[in-house]
Amino acid sequence: MQLRKLTTAMLVMGLSAGLAHAEDGAPAAGSTLDKIAKNGVIVVGHRESSVPFSYYDNQQKVVGYSQDYSNAIVEAVKKKLNKPDLQVKLIPITSQNRIPLLQNGTFDFECGSTTNNLERQKQAAFSDTIFVVGTRLLTKKGGDIKDFPDLKGKAVVVTSGTTSEILLHKLNEEQKMGMRIISAKDHGDSFRTLESGRAVAFMMDDALLAGERAKAKKPDNWEIVGKPQSQEAYGCMLRKNDPEFKKLMDDTIAQAQTSGEAEKWFDKWFKNPIPPKNLNMNFELSDEMKALFKAPNDKALN
């Protein structure tokens, strides 16, 4: 009788220990990490022309400041799942399709140039912030456009599906500016619209505008002007209600930022020559970015 009780107790203890171990090590059922573990592949969304955040270089390799975060997160997933040979699949996304493709499971997360705001939080979750930007204008140097009021009655281009597009339409309506707003497919198309003379200015996040200027045939012909219409926080985007995966992403980002690694990434992409033309964006680390690196957070700024 005593032996039977002892055996039963040992079985119960063993089962409890096994469950506890499963809870500690195995990802929650239905989570992104569970999906990755079962499929043996992590699918990462990336941008094609968001210089210098996430874009193709001369060899069609995906590179950039945000891509460095993305790569660090992939390595953290491999370590978490104990899968050093985990297959990594990269798929290109746009401002228009990034949220639907995330929601339907086409990709698992993306680090690009996606603004974390309260409206988007209804559709997706965001990691700790990786970059802080201001929304301004790219225009021809020495031209008539110096600030947003100068856009009255003019053609202005903006990238479709972005927060800048929403802001520009709101400004046009509230200020009765009579602008003709052109919505382009991606940032590259937006700049080509500006370069061809079909628009007098390109409204977008200042760091992205600096990236488009760096890609131009004659970068010195273009300047970034105007009082910022908003301050925005870029975050890596993941599906809602997945605290385990968000924690992994946040921990990875915080480690990079507080250790000084993220500042090295910034210097590499914003203060040194970068592909495809080895041009230097000459973009300084802002006070907002310095504060972020000291105290990582996932706060939406708008």
Swiss-Prot record:
The keyword Coiled coil does not apply. SMART domains: PBPb (SM00062). Keywords: Amino-acid transport, Periplasm, Signal, Transport. Residues 1-22 form the signal peptide. The keyword Signal applies. One of its GO terms (cellular component) is outer membrane-bounded periplasmic space. It is found in: Periplasm. It comes from the Bacteria. GO terms for biological process: amino acid transport. Part of the ABC transporter complex GltIJKL involved in glutamate and aspartate uptake. Binds to both glutamate and aspartate. Belongs to the bacterial solute-binding protein 3 family. The complex is composed of two ATP-binding proteins (GltL), two transmembrane proteins (GltJ and GltK) and a solute-binding protein (GltI). This is Glutamate/aspartate import solute-binding protein. The lineage of its organism: Bacteria, Pseudomonadati, Pseudomonadota, Gammaproteobacteria, Enterobacterales.
